[in-house]
């Protein structure tokens, strides 16, 4: 095949848009004339084109756009499919990736600018985020705002601060502001969490205090109920410990308080105004009903107490043999009726319950086995005084202790 003449090649180069001088063309033609071996005319033209681009690169001069456009057109996929699929010129490592080789229709005239447009002529003037198409303002425009969470905003702001460093100063300032906003959000969340923890701790302490108060109130109420039940159960079996009467939770040791004064007035009437009214009771208990290991002193133990706590003397008319005998009421009545007892008997037997004063001798004393001092001016106990624990105690003791003297004498 005959090669094209130099004039033809020169005219082709000039027609192709290459601005070259006559001297350069003549020199290139001389070079091509010497090296005309196995190259085709198309290959020679491509070689000349690349030689001109090389000269601009060596001279540190900007390459004109007219020299680059033919290369981009020549790399179209239908013509050179192997280049567009990752060939030598198609790789982005050689610097051709920014021109989107093989896609002339999708070329971006301003690669670093945000691509948000109104579909016609307007385009966003901000710089796009690195490796993104849009700026920070338009990067989330397509998402549903109603489904965005508060945590997502802070996390996205924290992520946006990292690429904003490589942007111009305006973008960098925006990134710093968004980062400070995210830090402030984290601080407010931490403060809110601490406040919630303190409120929970205060609520728990208040609930514990309220529970302890309710528990103490219930314990006090149960103590009073247990004491009244113990008094009623022990009065039925005639075995009442002296300590339970002396140390009652409601001060039932016959102290001069209004509650006990009401009990005395209900028992003996309003006409008697004695402050030291006492009653001595000695209740015998059958020994056969008690267990064998039951102490004799506990079997003969009788309740004792006085208004001042120091007057624990027993009545002079009660014989010591009555308390120590084990023959029952008839044995006590027929064995010994003496009215005096020695000091050993006084120290051996515990004091008896004194509800009437020792000096009160206006009413007759009955020599009965039970030793009940009955007054002639006895009045009935109204129901209002029995409602209290002290009133019920006085009523139970008198009703269980009063015995008709004539019935005892007939025995």
Curated annotation (Swiss-Prot):
PROSITE patterns: QLQ, WRC. Pfam families: QLQ, WRC. InterPro entries: Gln-Leu-Gln_QLQ, GRF, WRC_dom. SMART domains: QLQ (SM00951). One of its GO terms (biological process) is DNA-templated transcription. Residues 38-73 form the QLQ domain. Residues 108-152 form the WRC domain. PANTHER family: GROWTH-REGULATING FACTOR 5, GROWTH-REGULATING FACTOR 7. The QLQ domain and WRC domain may be involved in protein-protein interaction and DNA-binding, respectively. Transcription activator that plays a regulatory role in gibberellin-induced stem elongation. This is Growth-regulating factor 7. The gene is GRF7.
């Amino acid at each position: 095949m005959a090669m094209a003449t130099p004039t033809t090649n020169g005219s082709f180069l000039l027609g192709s848009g290459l601005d070259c001088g006559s001297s350069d063309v003549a020199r290139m033609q001389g070079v091509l004339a010497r090296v005309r071996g196995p190259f085709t005319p198309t290959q020679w033209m491509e070689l000349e084109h690349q030689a001109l681009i090389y000269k601009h690169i060596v001279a540190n001069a900007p390459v004109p756009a007219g020299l680059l456009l033919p290369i981009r057109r020549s790399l179209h996929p239908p013509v050179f499919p192997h280049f567009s699929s990752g060939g030598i010129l198609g790789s982005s490592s050689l610097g051709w990736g920014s021109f989107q080789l093989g896609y002339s229709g999708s070329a971006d005239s301003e690669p670093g600018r945000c691509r948000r447009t109104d579909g016609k002529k307007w385009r966003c003037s901000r710089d796009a985020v690195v490796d993104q198409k849009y700026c920070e303002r338009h990067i989330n425009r397509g998402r549903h705002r109603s489904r965005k969470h508060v945590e997502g905003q802070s996390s996205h702001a924290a992520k946006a601060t990292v690429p904003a460093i490589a942007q111009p100063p305006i973008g960098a300032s925006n990134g710093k502001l968004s980062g400070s906003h995210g830090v402030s959000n984290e601080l407010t969340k931490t403060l809110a969490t601490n406040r919630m923890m303190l409120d929970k701790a205060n609520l728990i302490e208040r609930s514990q205090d309220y529970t302890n108060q309710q528990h103490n109130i219930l314990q006090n109420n149960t103590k009073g109920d247990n004491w009244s039940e113990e008094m009623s159960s022990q009065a039925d079996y005639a075995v009442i410990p002296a300590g339970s009467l002396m140390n009652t939770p409601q001060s039932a040791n016959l102290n001069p308080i209004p509650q006990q004064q009401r009990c005395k007035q209900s028992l003996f009437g309003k006409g008697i105004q004695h402050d030291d009214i006492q009653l001595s009771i000695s209740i015998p208990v059958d020994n056969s009903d008690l267990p064998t290991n039951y102490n004799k002193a506990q079997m003969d133990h009788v309740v004792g107490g006085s208004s001042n706590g120091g007057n624990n003397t027993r009545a002079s008319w009660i014989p010591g043999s009555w308390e120590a005998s084990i023959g029952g009421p008839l044995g006590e009545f027929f064995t010994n009726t003496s009215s005096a007892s020695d000091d050993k008997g006084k120290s051996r037997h515990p004091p008896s319950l004194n509800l009437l004063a020792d000096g009160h001798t206006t009413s007759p004393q009955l020599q009965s086995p039970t030793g009940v001092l009955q007054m002639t001016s006895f009045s009935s106990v109204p129901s209002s005084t029995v409602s209290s624990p002290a009133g019920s105690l006085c009523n139970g003791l008198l009703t269980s202790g009063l015995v008709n003297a004539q019935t005892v004498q007939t025995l």
